[in-house]
């Protein structure tokens, strides 16, 4: 049957990538259909019950700045919040939250059901409708054909998925869900380059069988005994602490020599060590057997016992992801302090699945082979809810823009972690599941959590992603930051008018000549609050008083203070950005035959011919392409007078072919 209504965008899959893709396209005005094998699992947290972390929290803030759902859903579902790296510089501070699985899923479902221009339909997709080199729709498992102008594929671990527990294995998309075998076969027919990856999850434990008196309590920020007692962090720029449910602690235990002995005894039945698993696992979230094998000299590993929610006794033991046989899982869990009588509710397992080489994507995440077909999430070789959500939002945006006949939106590496993520995937590809770290960004001082809205909300508004309420809140914050920064720069402190005792109290010593407040705030040991109490509050501002702006005040002050203290570093980084931008604006001819560029080595020619970079900047980041090779390529292009060798538009976006 051909469904009687046509759509602009079809999104296949209802995980973290799919939900953000569907919401983004619908917010932008596209008639959007979200196809999922089970409406009850929309927004499901398939693995760990947490959102955020180093690098990952930055992505969540960026998704939020563009009107996405993940941060707000986390504020509604978060049962513990922490600011990681709080004692370090602002560039690497990151928010992390434990989330109640049921509350999180409910929040996402509510947002989906209440979003205009968005339709939900429960059916697995078995096939794509392709005419020539363009996708025109999707076909479900019972033969319903939906026509659309673009399709965003966010299949997660479902593509030909296989679960392993010991030497036993079976086909599945995740525990309890069937795999997408037909869809995977169809994609292979389209000759899209693919491979296999794997990920894993730990056994779940009944909290009633845990002796918490033998474990170390880990309260969240704002909880009794935690950092900043009484002040619980907030994830969304539109969120507040009143949205949070009841806050609860996590707990810590450790593996020991007995645990490691048990794990080693199961190596001969491990699918990872016996070759049953072909896919490569995530380097930064290894299985416990991998950790014991690789770090044989380490006597103990920290294990975090994380609550799955407020209405369940289920706990997630973060740190013992495993595919070992269940008898080994049973013994290794019970070998740890506090878990001697633990009851396992669900066994741990590994899952391997198909992914498609992201180097075959355009920088909009549209496939090069099939027009209108976009990929996002684990299908691109990434791991993590946050990476998936960011990609889904990005692909949804560009699918909607293509339907409008507009240029793709591609943030640069100096504009967003999303830009770093996209560029890394399409230029470097993956050899293992990719996760985000702050260390992946060259310009991370500019890419902080606190300024994600300043970097992206304006672009989101222009594309139709940001509603009036968010835009009004953002505009008030932006204007307040600007006004207060200017006030500090134009307010001068004269040593003749400042009592020495006050100067010593706030500044550490008397001043010898006139300074403006902004320059005084640049001093490492001078805080904003102390500065505004100087000389009886004479230098305080009404514009950012807590009485005037309420909760908006803290973010405003934070922005102003960071801008002052890191002004020199930020300015130097901006200079680096400008130098790098030259290459990013130079587009490479689409039809260039790199094998004919005689000045380049065979290796470089082969890599450029395979990857087909869109800009000189992308070419420079391909592994093995040296700065000398880039210089030679520039000479070749200039001598040849190639028409395509021209600057991109000033806003850094590219034309969708």
Curated annotation (Swiss-Prot):
Q: Which cofactor does it need?
A: FAD
Q: What is its main location?
A: cytoplasm
Q: Where does FAD bind?
A: 13-18
Q: Keywords in UniProt for this one? A: Cytoplasm, FAD, Flavoprotein, NAD, tRNA processing
Q: Where in the cell is it found?
A: Cytoplasm
Question: What residues bind NAD(+), as annotated?
Answer: 281-295
Q: Which Pfam families match?
A: GIDA, GIDA_C_1st, SAM_GIDA_C
InterPro entries documented for this protein: FAD/NAD-bd_sf (IPR036188), GIDA_C_N (IPR049312), MnmG (IPR004416), MnmG-rel (IPR002218), MnmG-rel_CS (IPR020595), MnmG_C (IPR026904), MnmG_C_subdom (IPR047001), MnmG_C_subdom_sf (IPR044920)
- Superkingdom field: Bacteria
Q: Give me any GO biological process, just one.
A: tRNA wobble uridine modification
SUPFAM superfamilies per the record? FAD/NAD(P)-binding domain
A GO cellular component entry from the record: cytosol
Q: Name one GO molecular function term.
A: flavin adenine dinucleotide binding
Q: What does this protein do?
A: NAD-binding protein involved in the addition of a carboxymethylaminomethyl (cmnm) group at the wobble position (U34) of certain tRNAs, forming tRNA-cmnm(5)s(2)U34.
Task: State how it assembles.
Answer: Homodimer. Heterotetramer of two MnmE and two MnmG subunits.
So what family is this one in?
Belongs to the MnmG family.
The protein in question is named tRNA uridine 5-carboxymethylaminomethyl modification enzyme MnmG
- What organism is recorded for this protein? Acidovorax ebreus (strain TPSY) (Diaphorobacter sp. (strain TPSY))
